[in-house]
A protein has these predicted regions:
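Short, charged recognition helix plus adjacent turn
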Residues: 1, 13, 38, 67-77
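Phosphate-coordinating loops and pocket residues in cytosolic domains that bind phosphorylated ligands
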Residues: 27, 41, 68
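Short alpha-helical DNA-recognition segment
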Residues: 20-38
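Intrinsically disordered, low-complexity basic tails/linkers immediately adjacent to helix-turn-helix/homeobox/MYB/SANT
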Residues: 57-70
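Residues within the helices of the helix-turn-helix
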Residues: 12, 23, 53, 64
Length: 77
């Protein structure tokens, strides 16, 4: 699995677990609506750590909790 695919997968998992929608989590984390739209539409890759950090802040989890999945150990380049 590629890194960006793993991150998107985890974002969806967290939102489902927490009963959040993606936009709300990112807005709570301080991302602009236009950046969220570009991310959702695939115009922007979300593999920057700051993007993941903002999502985590909005979702109420830590970066450690976000990346604590086995599939992050088998990332393709």
């Amino acid at each position: 699995m590629k890194l960006n695919d793993a991150i998107v997968k985890r974002i969806h998992e967290v939102c489902e677990e927490k009963g959040l929608n993606i936009c709300d989590a990112f807005l709570k984390g301080g991302m602009s609506p236009s950046a969220i739209y570009d991310l959702i539409k695939g115009r922007t890759k979300c593999s920057k750590v700051i993007t993941v950090k903002r999502f985590c802040e909005g979702a109420g989890i830590t970066l450690k909790e976000f990346f604590d999945r086995d599939y992050f150990n088998d990332i393709e380049e």
